[in-house]
Amino acid sequence: MIFDAIQEWFQELLIDGIISNLTGMFDTLNTKVGEIAGEVGMTPSAWTRGIFNMVRSLSETVIVPIASIVLTFVMCYELIQLIIEKNNLHDFDTWIFFKWIFKTFCAVLIVTNTWNIVMAVFDVAQNVVSQSAGVIISDAGIDISGVTADLETQLADWSIGALLGLWFQSIFVGLCTQILSICIFLVIYGRMIEVYLVTSIGPIPFATMVNREWGNTGQNYLRSLLALGFQAFLIMICVGIYAVLVEGISLSGDNISGAIWGCMGYTVLLCFTLFKTGSLAKSLFGAH
C-alpha cells in the first residue's frame, strides 16, 4: 500500500516535471522565433535609437571629413586621367573639364547624402520584409497548452521507467533549446550590429564611386548594403519554412519523444540556415 502510494506520487512528480519542461521548452522556442520576425523587420533607426544617433553622429563628425579628403584625392586622380587619356595631351579637348565638374558635383552630392542613401536601402528592405510577413506564416510556434490535459492523461498510463526516460530527454532537449536560443540571438543581434558598423563608414567608400578604377570600392559597399538589407527577407523565409515544419509536429503521448527530438532538429536546422543567410545574401548580390 505504501509502495503503491510512493509509486503514484513519484509518477505524478515525473509527469509534472515532463509537462513543465516541455512547456518551458516550447515557450522559449516560440518566444525566440517570434522575436526574429519582429527584430529583422526594424530599420536601424527603429531598432535602438540611442545606438543609431551615436553611429550617425560619429559618421557625420569623424568619417565625413576623412571622406572629403579621399574624395579630393580621387577627383584629382580622375582629372589627371581625363587629361592624359587622349593620346598623351596631343588630342586635348576642353569639354573634359565640364565632364570632370559634373563628376565632382555628383561625387559631392553622393557623399553629402550618404546617410539618406543608406537609410533608403534599409527602408526598401524593411518594406519588403513587412509585405512578406503577411504571406509567411506568422504563428511559427507549437501550442502545447491545448494538449496538456490529454498529454497528462496519456502519460498516466506509462511506467515509471518510461516516464523517467522521457523526463531525462525533456531536460536534455530543454538545455539544448536554451543553447539554440542563444544562437538565434547571436544571429539577429549580430546582423544589426553589423548594419551599424557598415553604415558608420559609408561616406568613405561612396567617395570613390565616380572613379573608374576606385569605383569598385563604392559599388561593392552598395552591394554589401543591399545584402545586409535583404538578409532580413531571407531570415523571414527561414522562419516561414520553420513554421510549416513545426506545424506538422504531433504532440501525442505515443509520439511525444519523437516530437521533442523533431522540434529540436527543426530548431537546429533553423539556426544553421540563419547563420547561412549572411553569406547567401552576399553571394546573391555579388558582395565580398
What name fits each language-model region?
Residues V173, T177-M209, R223-L245:
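Alpha-helical transmembrane segments of helical membrane proteins, especially in multi-pass transport
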Residues W100-K103:
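Elongated alpha-helical scaffolds
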Residues C76-I83, G202-R212:
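Hydrophobic transmembrane alpha-helices of secondary-active transporters
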Residues M1-V70, K86-W95, F105-C176, G215, ...:
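Gly/Ser-rich, low-complexity
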